């Protein structure tokens, strides 16, 4: 079994350099990412590289299964551009199925509302309302229950169509308290929400949830920490035999 990863395929685009930033730009991801129209922005990590690697892994596992059944090997090809187009899910399918070319919406969602970032009295919070029931609970906790029954906001399509007016009402209420207050209140009410954490806060959250996001490897008397494998197995737990080398070690 042989697997190759390229930037733009092994045919016409074989000579094109496959850098994550280039593919984020040329593959359309930056056109839907950023604070406002005219300000395309790259994702904060090399996400296209990661997604493509995962697609390659899926392909390899499928090929291994085929070989185990038939004894046949095969060649697998994955490219950054195709992986990105596949990973843009609803944005890509909107274009392919309906001819809609999506644009930048900042932190908003193109087809769900309210599903974005809201400023509170101290720091921003994310609210991800996925259905009408959650929206009614949100309005109840924000002490504006009449908004949930307003015909302009009664259903998700209504809320998307009247997004600007709705957000003005929500922001006014959110500014009345801090992010932690709203997080606790809304979460207890069943409204999906959460603060925008730093990397250190994100690791602390995972630790508090007993997800064990960091592992320590003792190598030659030295303890080295690294990010844990996110997959858990009931029969074959992940083993960490060797830590990554130190700078200039190899």
Q: Regions from the language model: what does each represent?
A:
Residues 95-102, 205-218:
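Short, surface-exposed loop/helix-turn segments at secondary-structure junctions
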Residues 60-64, 143, 250:
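Non-catalytic, well-ordered alpha-helical segments in soluble enzyme domains
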Residues 84, 162, 201-205:
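Beta-rich nucleic-acid/ligand-interaction surfaces
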Residues 187-209:
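Conserved PLP cofactor-binding pocket of PLP-dependent enzymes
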Residues 113-189, 193:
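Aromatic-enriched alpha-helical interface/lid elements that frame and gate functional surfaces
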Residues 116-120, 214-220:
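Short acidic-hydrophobic surface loop/beta-edge motif
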Residues 218-250:
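Flexible, small-/acidic-enriched active-site or ligand-binding loops
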